[in-house]
C-alpha cells in the first residue's frame, strides 16, 4: 500500500502512488 502523497509531501515508508 502507498500513503497519500500530495506535491511536496513528507517522505513515507512506501513509495507514493
UniProtKB/Swiss-Prot annotation:
Might you report a single GO cellular component term? extracellular region
Q: Where does the entry say this protein is expressed, by tissue? A: Expressed by the venom duct.
Top-level taxon of the source organism: Eukaryota
Q: Which residues carry this modification: 4-hydroxyproline?
A: 4, 6
Report if keyword Transmembrane helix is assigned. no
Which GO molecular function, any one, fits this protein according to its record? toxin activity
Alphabetically list the UniProt keywords: Amidation, Disulfide bond, Hydroxylation, Neurotoxin, Secreted, Toxin
Subcellular location as annotated: Secreted
List modified residues, type Cysteine amide: 17
Cystine residue pairs: 2-12, 3-17, 5-16
- Function according to Swiss-Prot or TrEMBL: Elicits excitatory activity in two subsets of the mouse dorsal root ganglion neurons; the medium diameter isolectin B4-expressing neurons and the small diameter CGRP-expressing neurons. Displays low inhibition of the human alpha-9-alpha-10 nAChR (IC(50)=10.2 uM). In vivo, intracranial injection into mice causes strong tremors and impaired locomotion for around 3 hours after administration.
Q: Domain description from the entry?
A: The cysteine framework is III (CC-C-C-CC). This peptide has a cysteine scaffold similar to the M superfamily of conotoxins, but it displays a disulfide pattern previously unknown in native cone snail peptides.
Q: What is this protein called?
A: Turripeptide ubi3a
**Which organism does this sequence originate in?**
Unedogemmula bisaya (Sea snail)
Amino acid at each position: 500500500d502507498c500513503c497519500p502523497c500530495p506535491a511536496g509531501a513528507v517522505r513515507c515508508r512506501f513509495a507514493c502512488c
